[in-house]
Amino acid sequence: MTGSLETMVSYVKSRANVSPATAVVLGSGLGHMAENVEGGIKVPYGDIPGYPQPTVEGHSGELILGNLRGEKVVMASGRFHLYEGWDLETVTLPIKLFHELGVKNLILTNSAGSVRVQNSPGTLMAITAHLDFTYQENSDTPLIVNEDRYHSAGLLHIAGESAERNNIDLKEGVYAWALGPSYETPAEIDLIRELGGHAVGMSTVPEIRAAGELGMKILTISCLTNYAAGVVEAPITHEEVIASAAEAGERFGKLLTSIIEHIGETE
């Protein structure tokens, strides 16, 4: 990151005369959801002074600002991961940018692996708590974090109602953050399951922490795109993750649209 946050915010505001109340971070293979934004103004990351570029397939690298069902929104298509070599400051930069743009509600989406056989690929899961399985801070056994400032009960309620309204099966569970970029071993998946995890992925928790510190209301929804290692015998590929996310895209998009339409009910 070479530019100042103030410069980045000023540039985005100069490109789009929108003061978004809600931000959505789109995970692997979910970038097409930005097409639902009405009057969407696209701001490529490469145009923002000093803003980094994502390197992972399925992350296009642009902000989309506009309206969705009457709610002013900004969507980020493309995120940054520690395994790409970025530091935490860069990984959480979009969250800080959203905050400076006036965002109050943050919806994080991701593609994750299912650690439980009953949650098959294509399952949508609202995250009620998280585990830090990276061991970056210490070697203690990870603990489940379910504080409301990281996982808004109000937004989880709206997500559940939106799923019911649209006849979408939305599970709830605990997301385990692993460092990546290699997929986890069967032994690691067994431990995550024992610790109470339901899904595992390589992103999102740094964003949850940053947004929580900034006072945003946070909702995280995972698309379980594959079984994690050892749950079934088939190997895992990134291509499978992107394909599964695309297949679930219609349901996911419908759910997100409904959530955003009703998100003002928590304010």
What name fits each language-model region?
Residues 11, 15, 154, 158-168, ...:
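Generic non-transmembrane alpha-helical segments
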Residues 229-267:
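His/Asp/Glu-rich mid-to-C-terminal helical/loop segments that flank catalytic regions of hydrolases
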Residues 104-105, 198, 217:
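Short acidic/polar active-site loop segments enriched in Thr and Asp
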